[in-house]
């Protein structure tokens, strides 16, 4: 037709161009992470890493073209970037917050009928304790993935009670594995045909990922024995940018050594106890901060709690809890200590 250019004529008049699309082990992006060490390292992730991670999200976490996902994490972070790739592959809808704020989250969920969210435990706690929580309709949400830090038992119990339409899914991962590696589905948060609930667990290995617990020499440990989480699969990073020694220390014999201490039960569920380097050793005894944090957080006056080890002449290390109270609440140090002993 007049004024139109044919496809064949267009191709014939254009010189060939090299395919610039990245693939397989070609570098896709560098994401900086300090983990809990405080020293940023550039994690090199390939196109294959992101494709594998996206398939994992779709297979493990129910992403589909019906998903309306709210991004509460920055896209510079793998907690934001990894689901962004996966949701695009699935054909879902992106709802992006400019920053996390409880009211912004409430409004976005209500306005856009968001049905999938990802929050760190602190965000969940902030929402539950916000004075305007009851004013918003949050019932459109079906799935809430949570992770990045341990969630206190009291916070999870409150979330389940106050948000009955939400199905909570625990997710564990790291930048070096393109995010999700272990997942705890909703059904395992309760007793059922599978047996007693596994709410204390991070979950089992996600789709396409191998996970084991190893000793410092990389030998796999028996079930129930604490060690370090090691991960293998197509999601594992290429390495750290310009840090060959750090890469060699982290990836050994094809396994990514995470630095997270955990044990695995007979059913393959992973129970995280602490960062390997952050375990508190007092009088020769291993003390896991999460266990103490759960005990402190069970007190009704406590809003947030973090447990650390501090130098002690007698015991080597002593346990210290840093506590923030709920508005209008009061409790003494002695009362909290007595509570933890009960």
Q: Which role does the model predict for each range below?
A:
Residues 2, 13-32, 39, 62-68, ...:
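Conserved pre-ATP/AMP-binding loop-to-beta segment of ANL
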Residues 28-52:
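Conserved AMP-binding A3 loop
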Residues 40-43, 53-58, 69, 106-108, ...:
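Adenylate-forming
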Residues 51-68, 76-116, 130:
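Conserved AMP-binding/adenylation subdomain of ANL enzymes
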Residues 89, 114-119, 128-197, 210, ...:
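Gly/Ser/Thr-rich phosphate-binding loop
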Residues 117, 233, 238-239, 249, ...:
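AMP-binding/adenylate-forming catalytic core of the ANL superfamily
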Residues 148, 173, 203, 260, ...:
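Active-site glycine-centered loops adjacent to acidic/histidine catalytic or metal-binding residues
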Residues 204-208, 219-249, 285-287:
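Conserved ATP/PPi-binding loop(s) of AMP-dependent carboxylate-activating enzymes
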